[in-house]
């Protein structure tokens, strides 16, 4: 009996048992928290999907009602409306040849059709019908009656004065934690668009966190290229590129911090323009990297032709925008510079020494150069403004998403997973890999952190400008990433954005003009593509662009800071010469 009591009451606890029990309890708690997080994320995503589906259904119903009550607007009229350039459309709206109602419903119907095929829209802005009813009060606006699509991260708030109902639409940037955080006000650009008579009518898809030039996220899914469903529409303004390239919008607003307007424009065969940072207001546009100042984002227009981009810039650069955002320099659009016919002194380079252009890119560039020379412009070959570049150091969001990989706080889109895996590795593993991968470093250009800091310094910008002045250049013609990549390859090929990212670093205005399409000969030549180094990234790039016959190919036009109108004028010259050729 004494032995029994000693066993029950006198036995000392075994610390191994206690520690094991504690560990099991902690593990169970972690699993429970992960499960709860999964459920919360899933519920948020489902709610967003239901909201989107309802908006699409209501838009479909409204279009059907309009068509039934307006039988005179037949398919021929709709086709005519959709074929007009922005300038022609605006003119016919102004003179009464077309009504805003007919134009709006024609584009809404086309948008719904394109979205079914490409999954490019995140939400129809149903309040656009209310704006349509009151549109005649803005008949003096430069964009009177024009439907405009906007990127998902651009703020849009709704106010119904009759019932005092005020609410905003989400600007998630494709990230679950930003769901159910509606905009508290219109972005400045949305306010100016409305003042100029434009009707924002749909929001378009983006990659998760705006951190890829693919276009997919766990909330709204993957967007497809309008010319080939196996290819990406680009990013991060990929929904805009797909919708405009598919004919569902005549004008869109995107944002660009590394090529996010220019890459989708190139991949989808449209024109896109990244203005000098702070030429257009960023107020009200959502971002996932707050406080980031080293590389500035720009909002800018995307459209089917360069004149549409210029008209949009002209409309936005007005007193109303400068009043709403007094931090901007009040520089109105210079129509005289845009319409100038003075011969240009054009710089040209075909290879930045880092990412060799594909055969179709190189051919398109050489053909454009020849056309410009034939038209009387002077083309010279200065050094490329960059011979090396490294990954974006702004890792706040990437690190946050890498935590999601470990802790399952929310799903990471396949478009981005490969890109963020290295950040989720333990520090010890990273150190081991850095030793093992040292030989690979010598295969490509030696990129040091000091070089990155140098690129960001003002000295570097002034050196490039000094070289530009020494060569007496007006503008620059250079390669544009393309043709469109196969889905999920962009995450593995962030190195190829050197051609676009450098002009964000330098804060130079830059735009994209489609000039050709991939030919069978280009595809044959691609079979022998080795790149600059013949390394793993060159091989990946070759795979990414394979199967691109018929896809659009673009060139990039660049000017010095604050010479946006000159850049657009150069883009129009390129567009005109290439159109005449074909």
Question: What spans do the regions from the language model cover?
Answer:
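Structural helix-boundary/capping segments
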Residues: 2-9, 41-47, 109, 113, ...
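Gly/Ser-rich catalytic/binding loops embedded in alpha/beta enzyme cores
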Residues: 4-258, 366, 370, 375, ...
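Soluble, non-transmembrane catalytic domains of enzymes that act on hydrophobic metabolites at membranes
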Residues: 81, 117, 364, 390-405
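Short, compositionally biased segments
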Residues: 153-166, 209, 322-324, 388-399, ...
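Short, surface-exposed loop/helix-turn segments at secondary-structure junctions
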Residues: 174, 483-500, 520-540
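General small-molecule cofactor/ligand-binding pocket signal
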Residues: 201, 378-383
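Short glycine/threonine-rich loop-to-helix capping motif typified by GTGT followed
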Residues: 361, 391-399, 486-494
């Amino acid at each position: 009996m004494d032995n029994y009591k000693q066993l029950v009451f006198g036995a000392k606890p075994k610390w191994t048992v206690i520690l094991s029990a504690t560990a099991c309890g902690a593990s169970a708690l972690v699993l429970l928290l992960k499960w709860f997080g999964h459920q919360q994320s899933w519920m948020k995503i489902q709610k967003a999907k239901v909201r989107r589906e309802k908006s699409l259904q209501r838009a479909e119903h409204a279009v059907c009602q309009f068509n039934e009550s307006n039988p005179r607007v037949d398919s021929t009229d709709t086709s005519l409306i959709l074929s007009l350039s922005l300038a022609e459309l605006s003119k016919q709206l102004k003179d009464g040849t077309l009504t805003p109602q007919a134009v709006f419903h024609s584009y809404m119907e086309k948008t719904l059709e394109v979205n079914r095929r490409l999954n490019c829209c995140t939400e129809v802005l149903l309040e656009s019908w209310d704006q349509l009813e009151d549109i005649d009060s803005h008949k003096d606006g430069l964009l009177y009656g024009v439907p405009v699509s906007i990127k998902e991260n651009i703020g849009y708030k709704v106010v119904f004065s009759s019932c005092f109902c005020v609410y905003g639409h989400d600007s998630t940037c494709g990230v679950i934690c930003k769901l159910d955080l509606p905009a508290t006000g219109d972005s400045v650009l949305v306010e100016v668009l409305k003042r100029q008579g434009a009707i924002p009518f749909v929001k378009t898809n983006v990659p998760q966190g705006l951190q890829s030039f693919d276009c997919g996220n766990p909330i709204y899914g993957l967007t497809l290229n309008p010319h080939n469903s196996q290819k990406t529409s680009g990013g991060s303004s990929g929904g805009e590129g797909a919708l405009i390239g598919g004919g569902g919008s005549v004008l869109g607003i995107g944002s660009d911090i590394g090529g996010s307007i220019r890459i989708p424009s190139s991949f989808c065969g449209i024109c896109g323009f990244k203005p000098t940072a702070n030429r257009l207001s960023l107020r009200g546009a959502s971002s996932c990297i707050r406080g980031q100042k080293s590389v500035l984002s720009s909002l800018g227009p995307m459209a089917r032709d360069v004149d549409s981009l210029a008209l949009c810039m002209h409309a936005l650069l007005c007193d109303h925008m400068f009043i709403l955002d007094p931090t901007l320099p009040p520089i109105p659009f210079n129509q005289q510079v845009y319409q100038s016919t003075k011969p240009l002194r054009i710089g040209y380079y075909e290879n930045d020494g880092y990412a060799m252009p594909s055969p179709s890119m190189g051919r398109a560039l050489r053909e454009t150069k020849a056309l410009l020379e034939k038209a009387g412009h002077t083309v010279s070959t200065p050094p490329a403004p960059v011979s090396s570049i490294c990954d974006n150091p702004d890792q706040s969001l990437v690190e946050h998403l890498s935590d999601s990989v470990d802790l399952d706080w929310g799903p990471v889109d396949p478009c981005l997973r490969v890109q963020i895996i290295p950040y989720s590795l333990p520090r010890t593993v990273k150190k081991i890999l850095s030793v093992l991968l040292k030989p690979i470093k010598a295969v490509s250009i030696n990129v040091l952190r000091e070089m990155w800091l140098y690129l960001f310094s003002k000295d570097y910008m002034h050196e490039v400008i000094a070289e530009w002045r020494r060569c007496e250049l007006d503008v620059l013609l250079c390669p544009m990433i393309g043709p469109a990549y196969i889905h999920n390859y962009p995450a593995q090929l962030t190195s190829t954005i050197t051609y676009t990212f450098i002009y964000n670093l330098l804060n130079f205005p830059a735009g994209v003009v489609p000039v050709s399409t991939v030919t069978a000969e280009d595809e044959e030549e691609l079979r022998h593509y080795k790149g600059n180094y013949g390394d793993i990234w060159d091989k990946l790039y070759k795979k990414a662009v394979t199967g691109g016959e018929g896809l659009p190919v673009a060139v990039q036009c660049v000017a010095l800071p604050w010479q946006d109108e000159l850049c657009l004028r150069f883009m129009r010259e390129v567009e005109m010469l290439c159109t005449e050729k074909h």
